Regions:
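Conserved glycine(s) of the Walker
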Residues: 16, 158, 250
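Conserved, well-folded catalytic cores of nucleic-acid-processing
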Residues: 23, 27, 46-50, 65, ...
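Catalytic P-loop NTPase motifs of RecA-like helicase/translocase cores
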Residues: 39, 63-64, 96-97, 127-128, ...
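Conserved C-terminal guanine-recognition region of P-loop GTPase G domains, centered on the G4
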Residues: 48, 53, 75-148, 219-222
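Active-site glycine-centered loops adjacent to acidic/histidine catalytic or metal-binding residues
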Residues: 58, 122, 152
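Canonical P-loop GTPase G-domain recognition
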Residues: 115-116, 125-183
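P-loop NTP-binding site
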Residues: 187-301
């Protein structure tokens, strides 16, 4: 009997949601960096386990929103959880039951999420096993989780057990996607996210949060190669020189790194062209939110 359903990944920023999604899917479709709040949209990844099709929804990290974009991101996270059959709350083992996690658990109880809710303690390689057991007991006392898993998403520990449990607990029904599809994100959006990831890794402090990337042109050539033109939108003119770097070194490095990653994902030769444009109000433009897969109205205060 086939099964299929949606599994939402929620948690604080940097809890390892995107790393777990990429590990489950077997390909990199969600940004992974050391900086918080890099995932902006709800990203769906598809994994198959036996006769079950698991559709993972990687949501933006839950945090206290300050701007319209922040509010839209948090709204997308809770919406993703509300629409899912199973919700996984990821908690970092070495950080434990933080104030942020407590607020998420409180919100889970208040909103009355449908479906099963499992606790996933991630990054278990960073703490002692006795501390893990104590943390599991402490968190489970704050909410009646259906199941608890201890994993290292980065190293793959415990991930197979989690996948098997999910496969057995999804509702019975036909698969919702072709068996060879790993994401419902358009390729042009995945390519834009890859470039944004490379920018985030190269730039510092607040600058990565002040920019966005859009794929403006996607042309498949007769030789199977792809020409991709992308625009990097900045909110401040003073940031342009930083993104370009001395003699254009930064933007060149980003372009090379992004092109290599896009080629690995697509399996074809890629010709990538990046341009920069300053749009001080891009965070207030409806079109930018649509491109990121967010609802502009969710950003209303």
């Amino acid at each position: 009997m086939n099964r299929s359903g949606f599994v939402a990944l929620i948690g604080e920023p940097n809890a390892g949601k995107s790393t777990l999604l990429n590990k489950m899917v077997g390909a990199k479709i969600s940004i992974v960096t050391h900086k918080v709040q890099t995932t902006r949209a709800r990203i769906r990844g598809v994994s198959v386990e036996d006769q079950s099709q698991i559709i993972f929804v990687d949501t933006p990290g839950l945090f206290k929103p300050r701007r319209r974009l922040d509010r839209a991101m948090v709204a997308a996270a809770w919406s993703g959880a509300a629409d899912s059959d199973i919700t996984l709350l990821l908690v970092e083992a070495h950080r434990g039951l933080t104030e942020g996690v407590e607020k998420i658990i409180s919100s889970i109880s208040e909103t009355g999420l449908n479906g099963k809710i499992a606790l996933v303690i991630n990054k278990i390689d960073k703490v002692d096993v006795n501390d893990l057991l104590s943390l599991s007991k402490e968190i489970n006392e704050s909410h009646p989780f259906t199941e608890t898993f201890m994993i290292s998403a980065e190293k793959g520990k415990g991930v197979d057990d989690l996948r098997r449990w999910l496969a057995l607990n999804l509702p019975k029904g036909p698969w919702l996607y072709p068996d060879d599809q790993i994401s419902d994100m358009p390729l042009r959006m995945i390519a834009a996210e890859i470039t944004r990831e490379k920018l985030t890794l190269r730039l510092h402090q607040e600058l990565p949060y002040q920019l966005t990337v859009e794929t403006e042109k996607w042309e498949e050539k007769p030789d199977k190669s792809v020409r991709i033109e992308q625009m990097i939108y900045l909110s401040k003119s003073g940031h342009k020189g930083i993104v370009l770097g001395k003699k254009g070194e930064t933007i060149k490095a980003v372009s090379v790194a992004s092109r290599v990653s896009i080629e690995e994902f697509l399996g074809v030769k890629v010709h990538l062209f990046l341009r920069i444009k300053v749009r001080e109000k891009w965070m207030e433009e409806t079109e930018r939110y649509s491109e990121m897969g967010l609802d502009f109205r969710d950003g209303n205060a």
